[in-house]
């Protein structure tokens, strides 16, 4: 089976779940191609980028300058030479194709692509990518079935939903399969009008063979805490920093590492300085997978206090939590989005309410005193949960079988 991944931007260091699924399909022996609208960050890449030669497998549709007017000029210049093609004219149908017609991105692509991209199935990651893929198929740029994976921001952000809800309803008709990553999102798609027969929950997972289950590590002095996340509001890292302020005031010895990059970096650093926590909180930025693994090995607890952003943006089910649970690192997170579908509070990890720094600090302080037997029981159940329900190899085999039926 030829599988093409349709992405708005590739590669992105924060979207390891996309990278992992691409390499999994390659490992299963499928012919894989990547079609992306824009080139992502090729400077900060994971080892798989080179190992699997993904640059050679990727076709970028646009190489645009920055800035709205510059983009529009670029697209107009690309559109004009292709006006002799019927698809280019068709792409200028504002009524049918909406903003992606008005901003000329569809016509620019149609003008430049002389031969369609052909695959048995196109897997579009995130709802907006599915919307664009369905339009490009109708315009003859893509040829194959389209399955769209819905993750989190694409089905929770108020800004995204205000723009894309009518587009999604078109996608429900044009597309072949909707793949929400959680039961919660499956319910939301149904409530938006997607026919139930076009919905199948397909979770993101982890490759269990990549993780050696470490021996039970009792919390040390200081307590070693770690977060690996894109630095955005919904990750709740500002709540974690506030909890750290309270822990320090209580005399709890700890060290906290926050790994990742993102738009909230300056805000988080300012908060650390404001609370005078520079001696206990470290933000080393982006680290490749092998360095992250070494830092995870040193950690006593993995912290991800996710929240609903002020714009409504929510998590799906964070892969970072799955990875920590798979390797045997205890996790502390929040009752948020699909996280309770992964972490059973008090049994395979610990959950506190969203935006509750006091509850988070209390949970971490209590964790620092946990006994070995209780910790071992939680860690064992956590790994079993991931192995049973979030095993990437099993999930991707099931997905491949499903895709062959559409």
Curated annotation (Swiss-Prot):
Q: What is its EC number?
A: 2.4.-.-
One of the GO BP terms on file: slime layer polysaccharide biosynthetic process
Q: Name its pathway.
A: Slime biogenesis; slime polysaccharide biosynthesis
Q: Which Pfam families match?
A: Glyco_transf_4, Glycos_transf_1
Instruction: Write out the entry's keywords from A to Z.
Output: Glycosyltransferase, Lipopolysaccharide biosynthesis, Transferase
Broad class of enzyme this protein falls into: transferase
Could you give a GO molecular-function term held by this entry?
Answer: glycosyltransferase activity
**What family is this?**
Belongs to the glycosyltransferase group 1 family. Glycosyltransferase 4 subfamily.
Name-wise, this protein is Putative colanic acid biosynthesis glycosyltransferase WcaL
Q: Which organism is it from?
A: Salmonella typhimurium (strain LT2 / SGSC1412 / ATCC 700720)
């Amino acid at each position: 089976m030829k599988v093409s991944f349709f992405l708005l931007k590739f590669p992105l260091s924060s979207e390891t779940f996309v990278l992992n699924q691409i390499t999994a399909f390659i490992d299963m022996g499928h012919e894989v191609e990547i079609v992306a609208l824009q080139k992502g960050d090729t400077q900060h890449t994971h080892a798989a980028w080179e190992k699997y030669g993904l640059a050679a497998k990727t076709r970028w549709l646009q190489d645009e300058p920055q800035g709205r007017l510059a983009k529009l000029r670029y697209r107009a210049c690309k559109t004009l030479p292709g006006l002799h093609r019927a698809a280019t004219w068709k792409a200028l149908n504002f009524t049918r194709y909406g903003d992606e017609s008005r901003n000329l991105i569809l016509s620019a692509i149609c003008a430049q692509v002389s031969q369609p991209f052909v695959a048995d199935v196109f897997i579009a990651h995130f709802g907006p990518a599915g919307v664009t893929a369905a339009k490009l198929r109708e315009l003859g740029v893509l040829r194959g079935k389209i399955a769209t994976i819905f993750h989190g921001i694409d089905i929770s952000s108020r800004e995204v939903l205000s723009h894309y809800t009518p587009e999604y309803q078109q996608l429900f008709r044009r597309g072949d399969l909707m793949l929400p990553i959680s039961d919660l999102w499956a319910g939301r798609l149904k409530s938006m009008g997607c026919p139930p027969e076009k919905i199948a929950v397909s979770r993101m997972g982890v490759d269990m063979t990549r993780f050696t289950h470490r021996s039970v590590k009792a919390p040390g002095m200081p307590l070693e805490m770690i977060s690996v996340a894109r630095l955005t509001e919904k990750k709740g890292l500002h709540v974690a920093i506030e909890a750290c302020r309270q822990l320090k005031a209580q005399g709890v010895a700890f060290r906290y590492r926050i790994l990742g990059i993102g738009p909230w970096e300056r805000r988080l650093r300012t908060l650390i300085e404001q609370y005078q926590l520079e001696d206990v909180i470290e933000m080393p930025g982006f680290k490749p997978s092998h360095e992250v693994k070494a830092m995870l090995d040193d950690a006593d607890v993995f912290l991800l206090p996710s929240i609903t952003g002020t714009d409504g943006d929510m998590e799906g089910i964070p892969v970072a939590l799955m990875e920590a649970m798979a390797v045997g690192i205890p996790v502390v997170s929040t009752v948020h989005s699909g996280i309770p579908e992964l972490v059973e509070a008090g049994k395979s990890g610990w959950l506190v309410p969203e935006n509750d720094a006091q509850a988070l600090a209390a949970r971490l302080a209590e964790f620092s005193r946990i006994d070995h037997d209780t910790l071992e029981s939680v860690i064992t159940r956590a790994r079993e949960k991931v192995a049973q329900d979030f095993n990437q190899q099993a999930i991707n085999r099931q997905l491949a079988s499903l895709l062959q039926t559409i």
